[in-house]
């Protein structure tokens, strides 16, 4: 089988070790005689799997007491509705920072349920920066402040955690940089992430919520969208995504073996540094419009000087075992997604290809 490095933005690359372990256990998990895919979600075998996954995640992130970990379905996009439906309480407004495509979708959905105050936006310069926090126009009476820590499509990442003000809790869509760097969970009211980037396969959403934010859902909320219902049932109100949770648990164990979040963050810095160096040193053959402090460590978005070369670049990259480099249709160009599971060898292979391509076509 030819070696391929998969730079897809999601569903994305999984650690080879995790895939190999899942393969070895596919027909018989730990001598049970059953595949995880066919286990009862309430049987002792799967209860062990989901318990271990939660405990490993708590250890990796240093999740404090007083926070619930929920394994949900519906993707991060469903959270754009679930968050306001659950967290508004007796308030009627939400603060949101607009830094790109996913922020805009969160704003659009939240407007169905609440007044939305866009505290700051970088749309004026095509989302190339994070607006200076001191200039944000916050509402002291907002139910929460929502931001997207990493814009997967645009390649922009918050380099810091915003400060909490007026007791307004922070809510973060961390879908594409979850577990990629150390964060102080205690600074957040809620964090959520779709699994298909740094956690596991699609079909799973991981949510961390401070317990004092539970129980505020509007009265007419559908039962399946109520955080309190899922928290009370330990993510077992209905049948959860058993196999994605199993794979996520394997990823968490793999991540612990890599030195935890601190260890993987160092590796992620190195990988991103290699790619941005080849872009910046290409004499304009490659370029990125994202200002340097806000460049994503997960999604390196760049363009070729001559768009006519785009298809040639993608075709030749694929011939060299470098897959899924086409940028999102909303922005064009290229996107190399280098999540935790992307080995540094894959990034070095891409860097070498980019240098060779620039020499040939520059």
Curated annotation (Swiss-Prot):
Its EC number is 2.6.1.52. It catalyses: O-phospho-L-serine + 2-oxoglutarate = 3-phosphooxypyruvate + L-glutamate; 4-(phosphooxy)-L-threonine + 2-oxoglutarate = (R)-3-hydroxy-2-oxo-4-phosphooxybutanoate + L-glutamate. GO terms for molecular function: O-phospho-L-serine:2-oxoglutarate aminotransferase activity; pyridoxal phosphate binding. It is found in: Cytoplasm. Its main location: cytoplasm. PROSITE patterns: AA_TRANSFER_CLASS_5 (PS00595). Its cofactor is pyridoxal 5'-phosphate. L-glutamate binds at residue 42. The keyword rRNA-binding does not apply. Keywords: Amino-acid biosynthesis, Aminotransferase, Cytoplasm, Pyridoxal phosphate, Pyridoxine biosynthesis, Serine biosynthesis, Transferase. Pathway: Amino-acid biosynthesis; L-serine biosynthesis; L-serine from 3-phospho-D-glycerate: step 2/3; Cofactor biosynthesis; pyridoxine 5'-phosphate biosynthesis; pyridoxine 5'-phosphate from D-erythrose 4-phosphate: step 3/5. GO terms for biological process: L-serine biosynthetic process; pyridoxine biosynthetic process. GO terms for cellular component: cytoplasm. Binds 1 pyridoxal phosphate per subunit. Pyridoxal 5'-phosphate binds at residues 76-77, 102, 152, 173, 196, 238-239. The modification N6-(pyridoxal phosphate)lysine is found at residue 197. PANTHER family: PHOSPHOSERINE AMINOTRANSFERASE. NCBIfam families: PRK05355.1 (NF003764), serC_1 (TIGR01364). Belongs to the class-V pyridoxal-phosphate-dependent aminotransferase family. SerC subfamily. Homodimer. Catalyzes the reversible conversion of 3-phosphohydroxypyruvate to phosphoserine and of 3-hydroxy-2-oxo-4-phosphonooxybutanoate to phosphohydroxythreonine. This is Phosphoserine aminotransferase. The gene is serC.
């Amino acid at each position: 089988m030819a070696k391929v490095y998969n730079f897809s933005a999601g569903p994305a690359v999984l650690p080879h070790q995790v895939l190999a372990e899942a393969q070895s256990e596919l027909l018989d998990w730990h001598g049970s005689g059953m595949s995880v895919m066919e286990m009862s979600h309430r049987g002792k075998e799967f209860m062990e799997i989901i318990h271990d996954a939660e405990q490993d995640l708590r250890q990796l992130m240093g999740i404090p007491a007083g926070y619930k970990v929920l394994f949900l379905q519906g993707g991060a996009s469903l959270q754009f509705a679930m968050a306001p439906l659950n967290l508004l309480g007796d308030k009627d407004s939400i603060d949101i920072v607009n830094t790109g495509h996913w922020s805009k979708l969160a704003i659009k959905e939240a407007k169905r349920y609440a007044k939305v105050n866009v505290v700051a936006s970088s749309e004026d310069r095509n989302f190339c920066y994070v607006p200076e926090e001191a200039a944000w126009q916050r509402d002291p009476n907002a139910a929460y402040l929502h931001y997207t820590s990493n814009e997967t499509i645009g390649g922009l990442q918050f380099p810091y955690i915003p400060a909490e003000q007026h007791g307004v809790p922070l809510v973060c869509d961390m879908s594409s940089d979850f577990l990629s760097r150390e964060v102080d969970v205690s600074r957040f009211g809620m964090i959520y992430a779709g699994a298909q980037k740094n956690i596991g396969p699609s079909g799973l959403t991981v949510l961390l919520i401070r317990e004092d934010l539970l129980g505020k859902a509007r009265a007419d909320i559908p039962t399946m969208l109520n955080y309190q219902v899922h928290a009370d049932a330990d993510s077992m109100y209905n049948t959860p995504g058993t196999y994605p949770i199993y794979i996520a648990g394997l990823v968490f164990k793999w991540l612990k073996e890599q030195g935890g979040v601190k260890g993987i963050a160092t590796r992620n810095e190195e990988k991103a540094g290699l790619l941005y160096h080849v872009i910046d040193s290409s004499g304009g053959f490659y370029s990125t419009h994202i200002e340097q402090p806000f460049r994503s460590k997960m999604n390196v978005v760049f363009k070729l000087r001559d768009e006519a070369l785009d298809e040639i670049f993608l075709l030749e990259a694929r011939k060299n075992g470098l897959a899924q480099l086409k940028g999102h249709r909303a922005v064009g160009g290229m996107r190399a997604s280098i999540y935790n599971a992307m080995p540094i060898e894959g990034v070095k292979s891409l860097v070498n290809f980019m240098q060779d391509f620039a020499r040939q076509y520059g």
